[in-house]
Amino acid sequence: MTMDKEMEYVYRRSRSVAIVTRNGKILMEKVFYFGRLFYTVPGGGIEEDETPEQAAIRELREECGLDGAIVRPLTVQYKSDGAAEYSFEVRIPDDQDAITGYDPEQTGDDPPLKEVLWMSLDEISEKDRAFLWAYGLMQVEGFFDEIKRWGDEISYPI
């Protein structure tokens, strides 16, 4: 495989996610993948002809029926296989309501995307919250202040 082909392969496997908040809640997706039900943010693979920003906006539209605009980049995580995962803070108009959309790459009678909903941090499991912190949620207005109000107790299994 040539270097150009390797880079093209890695680029297609890279992902972008959209962090959308409203009134102290985070737009989340309830999904069932690999035998596990969990919550995550809208996002997916970057197509060959798009930027990470364009991918985040496209995934938000496909999966949640929302038209958003990038506010700013939050994080870039590099995976061991060379792929990258980009996260962006995204704003949506106040008059738009999320709907459960689709993932055009997932076909069949039982798609993984089950529901789209607004959730507060205390409604999200610690495991799923860990991914939100990795995506840069603490940089989004209001969420760092919420974390400062939390206690110092250890609440996860030892």
Residue locations for each model-derived region?
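Short hydrophobic/aromatic beta-strand or adjacent loop that forms the aromatic wall/cage
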Residues: R13-V17, A83-S87, L113-V116
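Conserved hydrophobic/aromatic beta-strand scaffold that supports enzyme active sites
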Residues: M28, S87-E89, W118
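Nudix hydrolase/Nudix homology domain
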Residues: R36-L37, T100-I158
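Active-site segment of metal-dependent pyrophosphate-handling enzymes
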Residues: G65-E105
